[in-house]
């Protein structure tokens, strides 16, 4: 928080990694994750690193980093969270608390502005707009505040240009992004690896769909690593932010 007091950043997203033994078959882990935490983006990847070691990336991401469809760019910043309630009444209570939390709402507005700035670099002037602001999006274990920002891509640019303008995600780094990334490098004890990256595709029609690699497990040699973070702002309460990282990691750890 001292970096925020000093004026270096408005927000920085600090994460922690959980390493656990995982003797199960990786594809069985994926099948269980699909049941426990169905999300807009589900993926199972069997890969080999530069040293010839096999590993798997398994995820159920709720968040789009950037999408291009028929010349239109879309991004859906997510910020703020509460656990799901045990009853419909408790669930609604948590949702109302989330939308009434000044810290969570200010964080969401900041990330919406960051998304608008990202798209304004690659979209037709005055085409960028916020079409949905501060909706509650529910998942199996957690709920978030979500907004939608869109724009018409400059005809002289490609989906690769759009991706470059929007990476890394402000929701996984902070604002301003360049300084937030430097602070993350200073404070986090290990490289993030796949966490906070993207999983998705570019097609031959100029379209693109990229999920942020969150709620994602990295498996190698019967060990699984799951990483989750929380956005730190001036009035953040450390214990609350720590609990948010645990809530986010819960489905992947299970």
Regions found by a protein language model. Give the residues of each.
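Extended alpha-helical targeting/anchoring segments
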Residues: 1-254
